[in-house]
Amino acid sequence: MKKAKLIFKDNTPFSLDFDDFYFNFKDGLNESKFVYTHSFEWKNQENFIIAESGFGIGLNFFLTLKRFLETTPSKRPKKLFYISVEAFYIEKEQLREIYQKLEFYEEFKELLEQFLKFYPKAKEGIYRFYFEDCFLDLVFEDIAVLKELDFKADVWYLDGFSPNKNSQMFDENLIFEVARLSKKNTQICTFSSASFLQKNLKKYGFRVEKTKGFRKREMIKAYLENELEFKDKEAYFSRTFSSLKNKKVAIIGAGISSAVLAYELSLRGFEIDIFEKHLELGKGASGNESGILSSLILKPKVNLGEFSELSFIEASRFYRQILDLEFKGVVEFAHNDLMQERFDTQRENVLFKISKNQAFLEEGGVIFPKKLVKNLFEKSKACIYFNHEFQAYKFENGCFSLKFKNDVVKSDYAVLIYAMGADAKDFVFYDEMKLSKVRGQVTHLKPFLDTPFPLSSKAYICPVKDDLQVIGASYDRLNASLESKEEDDKQNIENIADFMDKNTKLEIIGSKVGFRSYSSDRFMIVGNAYDEAFYKEEYKALLWTKNKEQKPAKMSCNLYFNFAHGSRGFSTSVLAARYLCALINNEPLCLEKKYIHAIHPARFLIRKLKKGL
């Protein structure tokens, strides 16, 4: 992404890109309060959403968060969601320097340093920060990204530079998206009173009021009179807003996808019950002694590769923010010509430090799955029921009752989530959803290689832990055996031969078998279970009508899917959990539409219907 060209002028940050100050150089702090952060009233509701065009140095955000935290909880929303779009990246050290020069640093020190600790690299994406009762989604993209987002703001901060120097931030296209992402009575806050901005706001249903500005003649406020109606050509992927009888959630499965989800749900006040068929944690694919957190490296502009990168960096940031983990990096090796070609196209990617056939991923590293999963469940305060093998459910009067193999019945759940990994194949039976169960075996060796970070080529090698070194993993679609195979251990060892001296003698001290869940297109399957009969009837003519407005999708009930994470569940589970929480709790969706469409459970059927099949 573009980096901001910034200097100090009159002791105030000045943009060389727009030939304008970032804010009022005489009294920026009080102007931000007057125009934006103190110009509206909090509502005592579940979620309050503020959206901003132009994050800049983050002053509006920190002022808003400070006001939110200083307000008595009974007089403010339970959760604050703050979504801010920024196209020009400011370096971490430069941000700190700005606050110090402006003498704002001490006032915001604690919040600012928490923010800077997890500040991402200069790469497009949506990055979430966790503050007390507040989620900040920092969107590093051009403002046109709004057409890819889905939320309904309570308040908009239309910031940015002067309209005559940055007209895109106030033009008709932008105001249409602002209106689309607003609800009745949404308030617009802006320093500008430009006539063309007023005209655009009125065109899309805002009531515009002129009011006294900060140390100037006037500014405007605007309020949306009625929610905008617009045509949706892809309504089959649209969200359905949930209505819940209670806040009880049942999750089937106790692996990493379940653990991250349980933690995220707990932040929203849900009561979570986990049902696991085994007698303890760590018996499935999420129970390895060691593993790696890394990313696929594909060519630029490949959706799967870009999603893998975003999943990876957000997982790394999540584990650092929530579990205080530290990562030392991971080295990926190009072991064939195709991989080398991919590496060569990614030399400008800030996530990958590529040298010849090696890529160093600084945000990656070794993970300890059993410990990580256990810690997340403990933080979530979820109740885990072991030896509960799920069989079926009934959905009546807005609640689920669950039947288990041991004849136990659990009931009164408003939400049911399948997070059972490879076992999903035995419970989900859509015609076009092809799931596969892939066996993987890791090998436990006596320590043989001293490395501070994982190495990944045909197979991976983890650093030594507790006098044990893990390598892996095999890949077998045809074998469903739970027993370790000697030939798999041999294959794992052959696949790491490039890392060893020919005379190295390896001692196998154990192995572990797990099963991965895959979809046919390698994207995870995450979202609401859909009504297959409705889809087949309503969208049967998509071959001819795909460019016309579509009827909104119909889902079957509050049943959600969270599986097909493949071998990278420790990366993808974080975005999956956030997205599911947004669907369940009616929050801003934290993914761009292109990714929502890519992971949607109905995508396979829609592709077929578009072909007229």
UniProtKB/Swiss-Prot annotation:
Gene Ontology terms, MF aspect: oxidoreductase activity, acting on the CH-NH group of donors; tRNA (5-methylaminomethyl-2-thiouridylate)(34)-methyltransferase activity
Region feature (tRNA (mnm(5)s(2)U34)-methyltransferase): 1-225
EC number: 2.1.1.61, 1.5.-.-
Region FAD-dependent cmnm(5)s(2)U34 oxidoreductase: start-end pairs: 252-613
GO cellular component assignments: cytoplasm
Subcellular location: Cytoplasm
Cited HAMAP family: MnmC
Main function: Catalyzes the last two steps in the biosynthesis of 5-methylaminomethyl-2-thiouridine (mnm(5)s(2)U) at the wobble position (U34) in tRNA. Catalyzes the FAD-dependent demodification of cmnm(5)s(2)U34 to nm(5)s(2)U34, followed by the transfer of a methyl group from S-adenosyl-L-methionine to nm(5)s(2)U34, to form mnm(5)s(2)U34.
PANTHER family cross-referenced by the UniProt entry: SARCOSINE DEHYDROGENASE-RELATED, TRNA 5-METHYLAMINOMETHYL-2-THIOURIDINE BIOSYNTHESIS BIFUNCTIONAL PROTEIN MNMC
Name of this chain's protein: tRNA 5-methylaminomethyl-2-thiouridine biosynthesis bifunctional protein MnmC
Organism: Campylobacter jejuni subsp. jejuni serotype O:2 (strain ATCC 700819 / NCTC 11168)
Gene: mnmC
